[in-house]
Amino acid sequence: MGYRVQFTHRAEKTFVTLPQHIRIRIEKALNNFSQVPFYHQDVKKVRGCPPDKPRYRMRIGEYRVTFRIIQNRLIICVVALGKKENFEY
């Protein structure tokens, strides 16, 4: 059973403003990751986050997606996304 992908309100607002081909690419990457969440070469742990609430980042071309994995509820919660050059983790 795979994980379910959810967006925060802010991430959802950013996501809908992206061009359609970028949205499709991000959706595919998140869906692939949700099937096997702990084995993906373009995912790294974000440094500086509290140990009880770790965040991860995924590289999708020139875009970055930051998310949390909520294991007890099988949810991948997308916190933020955007282009690499103006993205804050």
Regions found by a protein language model. Name each.
Residues 2-4, 9, 13, 17, ...:
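Enriched for short, Lys/Arg-rich terminal
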Residues 32-57:
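A short, surface-exposed loop/turn module that caps and links secondary-structure elements
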Residues 25-29:
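A short, well-structured alpha-helix characteristic of acyl/acetyltransferase catalytic modules
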